[in-house]
């Protein structure tokens, strides 16, 4: 071979050995096929479970990843068990997650097939799970004789000294049907199934009413209410008068009962001692609060008008 110099062209044979080339091609082909198979499986899972978003499923604990519980959910397409993720914030404090144990879960979302990890995002703390559990246990709900109007749930209370609790408001259009009794069942048989599934969570089933005073009074169950005053209907603010011996029950441990009642009804609820209530002073306080809120809004409300726009006459 002639000696090469700077600027010369050199031709080299870089053809791989036949065996090496065949092995590399086989590995690449296998990887491509495996990826396509995984993509197709995830697409099938997505198509199957999207229709079940907002409903309950049964999952079996497979393993733990970081602070999430990975569950196996049955697939109706003959696929292997589909994995679902139960994040820490969706877990119940009273649950004991052990490998092989089964739980009812609420399917919140089916993730896109292109994403990594479990495609199903499930919850044990969603109010939707309570609705689904009652729907499964109460035939009158399935038959649309009883309807669930509202649910307020505190599955993970801010304090460990307070347990999970749910308030559920029910109603019926049938005069001969007791919606509360239908949900509770004979000797509490129906509601007990739901309570057991939620590991002893306290559940209050109350009667919904179109009358705000009655609805608020029912929502504060089991406390005995003397009077409900709608002191600011536009602002949905109410004063609830109770006997002194009912104050702690109406408010609840660390305010949980009144907090859930407010969320259930959509009203701001102030619990007052009936014996010490001064209606004139109370209304003056409400009016003062209303004026303060109005001044705050007028002072700090941003001006959304576009400086470049022209008002039409």
Name the predicted role of every residue range.
Residues 1-313:
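RNA-contacting regions in translation and RNA-metabolism proteins
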């Amino acid at each position: 071979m002639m000696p090469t110099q700077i600027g010369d062209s050199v031709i080299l044979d870089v053809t791989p050995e036949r065996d090496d080339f065949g092995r590399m091609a086989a590995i690449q082909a296998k990887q491509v096929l495996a990826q396509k198979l995984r993509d197709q499986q995830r697409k099938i899972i997505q198509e199957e479970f999207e229709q079940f978003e907002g409903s309950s499923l049964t999952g079996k604990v497979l393993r733990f990843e970081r602070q999430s519980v990975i569950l196996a959910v049955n697939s109706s397409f003959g696929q292997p068990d589909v994995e679902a993720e139960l994040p820490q914030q969706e877990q119940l404090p009273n649950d004991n997650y052990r490998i092989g144990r089964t739980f009812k879960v609420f399917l919140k979302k089916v993730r896109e097939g292109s994403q990594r990890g479990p495609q199903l995002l499930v919850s044990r703390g969603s109010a939707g799970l309570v609705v689904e559990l009652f729907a499964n246990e109460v035939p009158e709900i399935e038959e649309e004789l009883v309807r669930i109007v509202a649910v307020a749930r505190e599955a993970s209370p801010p304090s460990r000294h307070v347990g999970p609790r749910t308030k559920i408001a029910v109603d019926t259009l049938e005069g001969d049907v007791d919606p509360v009794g239908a949900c509770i069942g004979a000797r509490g048989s129906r509601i007990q199934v739901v309570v057991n599934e939620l590991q002893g969570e306290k559940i209050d089933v109350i009667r919904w009413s179109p009358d705000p005073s009655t609805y608020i009074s029912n929502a504060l169950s089991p406390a005995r209410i003397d009077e409900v005053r709608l002191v600011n209907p536009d602002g949905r603010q109410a004063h609830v008068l109770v006997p002194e011996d009912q104050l702690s029950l109406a408010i609840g441990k660390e305010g949980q009962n009144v907090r859930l009642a407010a969320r259930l009804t959509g009203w701001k609820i102030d619990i007052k001692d009936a014996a010490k209530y001064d209606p004139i002073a109370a209304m003056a306080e409400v009016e003062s609060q209303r004026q303060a809120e109005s001044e705050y809004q007028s002072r700090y409300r941003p001006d959304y008008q576009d400086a470049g726009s022209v008002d039409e006459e």
